[in-house]
Amino acid sequence: STSAGATGSAGKDEYNDYGRGASAGNSGALERGDDEMRAYNRHWYKTAVENLVLRTRSIGFIEGGELGRDFRRRYGIKPAQAAGLGIFPSHHQKMILTDYALPDRATGFVMGHNLLRNYWDTDDHPFESTLRDGFKPWHDLSTRVYGPILNDLKRSFEDAWEKAEPSGQPVPKLLASEVFARPALRRGKGEMAQICRTLGLEERSIRDIYHLTLANARVYVYFENQYFRYKPLAMHLRAIRRALKGAGWPRDFYVFVVTNVPDGHGRVNTYEMLQALGKSTAMPHFHKKNGKGDDDKLVKADLDGVHIHVCSLATSGNTEQGMEYRPIYVHSKLMLIDDVFFTVGSANVNVRSMEVDTELNIACTSPTLTKEWREKLWKLHTGRMPSGNMADEFDAWDEIIKNNAKRMVNKQHLAAPLIEFFDDSSTGLRAD
């Protein structure tokens, strides 16, 4: 099940243009007015795969209008902005469930990746690669799951399937959760996990799991996300630190962020997020334009003892013009807390993912897996094996980004992909 505007699509700069008419789900053949190609496409898709059923759906205007009114009530935003959120939501979940009827083979994927070939890259994210089909160096995360959680994935899919087209067409019978447990345990030690979702006004459990786990964080939080522009989350983090400080909690707290420098869309929201975390100087033109706000003193008080790094990723390479640098595009949607908890999936740190679009994440309390995520990712980004001491890690990140800044000035190869987030653009739009 997918959104109507995304069926078989790939963007205009991508390999496949069958769905370039995103607003209406048109194919490239239709856009070019090629009736012969249209007929061929229809015949090919009809006969290429037997027993293939595709359903598309969009979020209706009534539900969209309710979403818009909800935003106006809670955030006091302008009618046009509220209408945009309500009228143009998307189905953003990325999930695969295979061989469900065969418990010994059943497998689920809860993903950040889109199902397009040009979202592929290696962990090295080279400056140039003949294997990478399109785009730029690309960093993304997904999970493979087994066991009783497959029933939750199936229920979630069935819900979307029936909403798309309640035709009464049969779907595989829901099996008892227990039948998936034994095959999964043969693969190794299991961990407790659950799915969480965003379904418009119906469910916002991804937002809830972010709020709940941040409230319990005591040592560090790591965000690795395509977007970092959901100000309510920053304000929630500040409220938690303020409450802990008032209760006499003595320890420092560390926030590590890896995200992208925004394009024109979303720059205003990103600035507001960074401003709420006392990092607005990373966007100097916006910082100068907005000056010191009424919240500045509160930011310092709330975040006393909170140490924050906001970073991006890049790679370097020699070209005919000399040394050049390219961003590694971060498409991940991951949060780690205290080497105890992680959530990963399709949800970005923005309003759309937390409150509007349909999203699917997995949430897991597992010291083993959370530490494994952190060690592998931080080694990729910093070029060194991280320790478990967050004060030492914070200093190590600081040293790496300063070293890379000097290397970029001197036109040298980067020592590691991690660089400081910096956006010197003077213009930008609000996008949620």
Positions of predicted regions on the chain:
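Glycine-rich phosphate/diphosphate-binding loops that line cofactor/substrate pockets in enzymes
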Residues: 101, 207-222, 240-250
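Conserved catalytic-core segments centered on acid/base and nucleophilic motifs
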Residues: 96-98, 213-230, 332-337, 341-346
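Classical protein tyrosine phosphatase
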Residues: 1-10, 228-255, 271-274, 353-355
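Structural motif corresponding to the C-terminal cap of alpha-helices
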Residues: 199, 225, 241-245, 318
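HKD-type phospholipase D/PLD-like phosphodiesterase module
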Residues: 1-216, 258-333, 352-354
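Long, C-terminal catalytic modules of enzymes
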Residues: 108, 113, 207, 231, ...
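Intrinsically disordered or highly flexible coil/loop and linker segments, enriched in small
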Residues: 119, 162-173, 219, 223, ...
